[in-house]
Structure formats: structure tokens, C-alpha cells
């Protein structure tokens, strides 16, 4: 399969595909950089205003002591990263954070918790948080780990709009990164979320020691879901001392930008989020990511426990590029 053949069937005309082969997607990755950027921008402009970016804020509502062993995560109880465990935040504190985020230009407020999955009273507190944030007129998003059908429906009734559950990497590379839950566990939770009528937010991480084929397989898995994720976060690994990936080699910047572009081409109507890792990117790299089809970012100085681009930097960058928040 040539890249030209793959592009001929890409969704420039509004028809969404769910039958991408790994070979087609690898052919897109292999395009000359300028050609790939041009094609991604064409697809982007067919479905979005290329100069508008959706802005979200993400906070950790419960930090540390997670029982999972995700080898990139400082919140895992399996690793000594020096992260201080924090109990579940109070509802009022979360709602106030959301209010501040709205004042700073965020339209969506995302809440993350270091759980395998929500349980008991903690779940009900999280439900109250969602209700409180929704009352501010913001879109709501949560990432609480594995969900069952009842929990997903309860979150929907509380006013949750989006549920994030990343697949992280390819099915083949997954067990090299995480062993405490399976790739299928993640897909099952996404099915539950979709069936409850929630918008799906799901993407992955570049820099986990994966190959280009792994990146293609990750994109293939996302693009071939029954419905494309409404939001596709593409993260650049932030190496954290104490985790197994602390000394992981930083991916080539152009490989990361290619991943953004291929996600845009294969999932034309999805928001592609330039997610974790922006703090370590130059303005020029971020600009190329927007040119490749990224149209969503997280604002605020932290993403859960990781550093993020400060609001002032984003305002400056948006001004230089002529971008406007949605």
C-alpha cells in the first residue's frame, strides 16, 4: 500500500474510515515531511477552523499510591519517585479550581485520580465534583481508571461530557510498559464509556521505547474503533526519576510531529490534543504540531503532577501564531 493510495481513501470528503491497515498508516508515516504536513493541514481545514484551539485544564483530584505499574508514571506505588501522596480533594476546592480555569480561558475541565478504578464514597465525591463543575457552564472530563457500566451511566447522569482512558501504545508494545492491567481492559472500559453515551477521549504516549510500527499500530487501534475518539491526546513522555522510563531516549521531534499529522489524517473530525510534554517543546515545535493538525491543548502550570506550559507562555504563543481559543 502506497501513501498515495492511503491518502486517496482518507476522509477529505467527510467519509470516516474504520478499516485502516497498519501498512497504510506506516506509509503515511513514511511520507516526506512536507507532503505529510500538507495533507494533514488539508484534512484539518476540511473539518475545523485551523486558527482556533480548544483549551482544557487538567487537575489531580487524588494524587499518588496508584496500584498500577505504568512504567512512565510518578504516581505509581511501585516506584520511589518522591511524590507525596495526597488524599481526595474537597468538592469545593475542585469547583474553585474550575472557576479559575474558566476565567483563564479554559472551556473544559478535566479531573484525574490515581485509582485503578473509582470505589465507594470516593466515587460519590467525584460525582459531586462533576456536578459542581458542570454547574459553572464548563464541559467536564474525567480520568478515573477502569469503569463498569453502572459507574459510566452514573457519571453521565451527573453531567460528565468526556471520559479519558488512553491506550498508551500499540497492543504489541503494551506489556513492556504496563503489566497490572491488559490492553483489552482498556478497550473494554472504552466500550463501556461509549455505550453510556459519553464522549471518548483516548490517545497515547510517544517515547515509551516504541518503534514507528508501534506508533502506527496505536493510531490504527484508535482509528478503527467503532466511533473515532472525540478527543485524541498525543503525549510526549516526560521522563521521571524513579520510574523505569526515567532514562528513556527522547524521541526525535519530527517523529512526534508526524504522529500528530497521521492522527489528524486518520481521524479527521476528532480533536487532536497536543498534550503532556509541551513544557519541554520549543515554540517552533509546537507551531509545527498545530500545522500538523493539533487543535487542543491543556492550559495551566501542571498536568496532574507534571509541569506544563504556563498560561502566559500560551497567550504569547497563540498571539504569535494568530490562534484563538475555542
Curated annotation (Swiss-Prot):
CDD domains: Radical_SAM. Its cofactor is [4Fe-4S] cluster; [2Fe-2S] cluster. InterPro entries: Aldolase_TIM (IPR013785), BATS_dom (IPR010722), Biotin_synth/BioAB (IPR002684), Biotin_synthase (IPR024177), Elp3/MiaA/NifB-like_rSAM (IPR006638), rSAM (IPR007197). The keyword Iron-sulfur applies. GO terms for molecular function: 2 iron, 2 sulfur cluster binding; 4 iron, 4 sulfur cluster binding; biotin synthase activity; iron ion binding. Residues 51-278 form the Radical SAM core domain. Signal peptide: none annotated. [2Fe-2S] cluster binds at residues 110, 141, 201, 273. PROSITE patterns: RADICAL_SAM (PS51918). Binds 1 [4Fe-4S] cluster. The cluster is coordinated with 3 cysteines and an exchangeable S-adenosyl-L-methionine. Its EC number is 2.8.1.6. Homodimer. Catalyzes the conversion of dethiobiotin (DTB) to biotin by the insertion of a sulfur atom into dethiobiotin via a radical-based mechanism. This is Biotin synthase. The lineage of its organism: Bacteria, Pseudomonadati, Pseudomonadota, Alphaproteobacteria, Rhodospirillales. The gene is bioB.
Amino acid at each position: 500500500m502506497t501513501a498515495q493510495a492511503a491518502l486517496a481513501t482518507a476522509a477529505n470528503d467527510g467519509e470516516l474510515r474504520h478499516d485502516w491497515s497498519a501498512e497504510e498508516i506506516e506509509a503515511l508515516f513514511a511520507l516526506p515531511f512536507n507532503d505529510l504536513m500538507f495533507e494533514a493541514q488539508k484534512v484539518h481545514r476540511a473539518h475545523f477552523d485551523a486558527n482556533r484551539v480548544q483549551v482544557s485544564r487538567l487537575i489531580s483530584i487524588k494524587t499518588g499510591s496508584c496500584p498500577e505499574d505504568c512504567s512512565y508514571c510518578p504516581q505509581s506505588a511501585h516506584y520511589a519517585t518522591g511524590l507525596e501522596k495526597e488524599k481526595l480533594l474537597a468538592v469545593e476546592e475542585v469547583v474553585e479550581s474550575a472557576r479559575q480555569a474558566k476565567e483563564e480561558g479554559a472551556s473544559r475541565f478535566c479531573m484525574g485520580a490515581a485509582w485503578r478504578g473509582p470505589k465507594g464514597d470516593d466515587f460519590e465525591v467525584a460525582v459531586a465534583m462533576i456536578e459542581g463543575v458542570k454547574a459553572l457552564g464548563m464541559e467536564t472530563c474525567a480520568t478515573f481508571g477502569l469503569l463498569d457500566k453502572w459507574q459510566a451511566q452514573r457519571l453521565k447522569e451527573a453531567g460528565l461530557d468526556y471520559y479519558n482512558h488512553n491506550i498508551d501504545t500499540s497492543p504489541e508494545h503494551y506489556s513492556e510498559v504496563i503489566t497490572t492491567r491488559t490492553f483489552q481492559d482498556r478497550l473494554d472500559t472504552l466500550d463501556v464509556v461509549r455505550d453510556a453515551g459519553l464522549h471518548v477521549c483516548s490517545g497515547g504516549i510517544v517515547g515509551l521505547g516504541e518503534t514507528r510500527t508501534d506508533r502506527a499500530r496505536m493510531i490504527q487501534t484508535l482509528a478503527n474503533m467503532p466511533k473515532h475518539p472525540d478527543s485524541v491526546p498525543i503525549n510526549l513522555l516526560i521522563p521521571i526519576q524513579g520510574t523505569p522510563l526515567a532514562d528513556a531516549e527522547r524521541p526525535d521531534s519530527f517523529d512526534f510531529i508526524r504522529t500528530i499529522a497521521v492522527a489528524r489524517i486518520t481521524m479527521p473530525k476528532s480533536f487532536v490534543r497536543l498534550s503532556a510534554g509541551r513544557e519541554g517543546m520549543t515554540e517552533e515545535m509546537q507551531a509545527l504540531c498545530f500545522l500538523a493538525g493539533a487543535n487542543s491543548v491543556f492550559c495551566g502550570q501542571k498536568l496532574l503532577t507534571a509541569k506544563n506550559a504556563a498560561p502566559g507562555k500560551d497567550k504569547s504563543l497563540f498571539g504569535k501564531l494568530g490562534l484563538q481559543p475555542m
